[in-house]
Amino acid sequence: MVNTRDFLPKTTHYLKVPIIGLNAILWLLGLVLIVVGSVCISFFSNFKEFTKESGYKNALSNLTTSAPTGVLVIGIFFILLTLVGCFVAYKEKLVGLVLYTMLMLILLVVLIGIGGKALTLDKEDAVSIIGTSWVQISNSLKNSTITKLEDFLECCCWSESYSNQTYKDLCPKDDDGNIKYEDTYCEGIFTKQVSSKLVLVGIAGVVIGCIEFVAMALSLFLIIRICRSPRSRAYDQY
């Protein structure tokens, strides 16, 4: 029978140092998540009125509000959790390490889920929904919303198929009344913006998840080592 003691470091020092190091890296990556979430929220905040007027309000809300806010909240939670991880690892707090590891496991599942969803999301379907809503709102009394979005995205008309004079009348114009971004269609601009942000969120989620898994595994080894330590009964485990 294999003796698992042979696989563990002889002292907790060799586990504490990499755990603290990985948590420091994860803290920095938590900042990255906050920045990414903030950028996405800032970008999609311009679609608030568009989403409200759209016939696909629920679907668009998930893309423009729920997902970016979720990334931001996870980033904030991550920063707090990694600080706790550094403290309980350094002080060898057994109960603290157990709680930290459990929370890391939950966060790992959430991160991999978000990262995988972002990378595998059907971008064509999302763009199709936006396009349908774009045309719908362009032909409604709230078409000023489209002019604001086109000015923000620096484009004119959703696509070449919808570039007749009716749609061009909504395009942003300069002081002389000339169309600013003629022949620069919003479909291509939007697709590029959304794709880059989804890829960034997806890669960040997967990379952080992998590093987090290693930190969590080392924390489990540290818990086992503390429990097996001759001094474990004398420890301040709380």
Swiss-Prot record:
**What are the alphabetically sorted keywords of the record?**
Glycoprotein, Membrane, Transmembrane, Transmembrane helix
- Sorted alphabetically, which InterPro entries does this protein's record hold? Tetraspanin/Peripherin
Q: Where, per UniProt, does this protein localize?
A: Membrane
Glycosylation sites noted in the Swiss-Prot or TrEMBL record: N62, N143, N164
TM annotation in the entry: 17-37, 70-90, 94-114, 198-218
Q: Which Pfam families does this one have?
A: Tetraspanin (PF00335)
**Membrane topology of the entry:** Multi-pass membrane protein
Which residue intervals are topologically Cytoplasmic?
1-16, 91-93, 219-238
PANTHER family per record: TETRASPANIN (PTHR19282), TETRASPANIN TSPA-RELATED (PTHR19282:SF417)
> What family is this protein classified in?
Belongs to the tetraspanin (TM4SF) family.
Q: What name does the UniProt record give this protein?
A: Probable tetraspanin tspC
* Species, as recorded: Dictyostelium discoideum
Q: What is the primary gene name for this protein? A: tspC
